Amino acid sequence: MAVYEILKMGDPVLREKAKPVTRFNSNLGRLIDDMFDTMAAARGVGLAAPQIGIGKRVCVVEVGKRRFELVNPEIIEAEGEQCDAEGCLSIPDYTGRVKRFQRVRVKAQDRKGETFIAEGTDLLAVAFQHEIDHLDGILFVDRVENDNPEE
């Protein structure tokens, strides 16, 4: 498997809206496997294809023992609120507090094109939202809450 270089903030690819996947073949499977390897090598919990320079709607998430490959994901239900510190493999050495939904349901496809629903709460919900934001050209720094309400 290959480990890709992760693009850093400032690279224009990170600000582009990724295109839907329409071909479900062995190339997609290899990409997903390589994304899991890249994420693990970087010690992350999620990685979106645009972070490795590929403008497709693909992301991978691993929280605890739960591992997800999300192709063409969309949030179909969300509730609650949480505001916690986030970081990003594309923005090393920076964290900020981000307001996110506490629970989300995501409709996505797997590498074979099969549709499924994934539900996440707490950190898993944050990871889903963070990676789907990447697919829309949004970085977590765009959503950082002001830590000092008097500023």
Swiss-Prot record:
Q: Which cofactors, if any, are listed as required?
A: Fe(2+)
Give the family, as the similarity comment puts it. Answer: Belongs to the polypeptide deformylase family.
So what does this thing catalyse?
N-terminal N-formyl-L-methionyl-[peptide] + H2O = N-terminal L-methionyl-[peptide] + formate
- Which taxonomic lineage does the organism of this UniProt entry have? Bacteria, Bacillati, Bacillota, Clostridia, Eubacteriales
Known EC number: 3.5.1.88
Q: How is the cofactor bound?
A: Binds 1 Fe(2+) ion.
User: What is this protein's function per UniProt?
Assistant: Removes the formyl group from the N-terminal Met of newly synthesized proteins. Requires at least a dipeptide for an efficient rate of reaction. N-terminal L-methionine is a prerequisite for activity but the enzyme has broad specificity at other positions.
One MF term in the entry's GO annotations = metal ion binding
- InterPro entries the record matches: Peptide_deformylase, Peptide_deformylase_sf
A GO BP term here is: translation
Q: Please identify the protein, giving its name as recorded.
A: Peptide deformylase
| Active site (catalytic residues) | 131
Keywords for this protein: Hydrolase, Iron, Metal-binding, Protein biosynthesis
Which residues are involved in binding Fe cation? Answer: 88, 130, 134
Tell me where on the tree of life, at the top rank, the source sits.
Answer: Bacteria
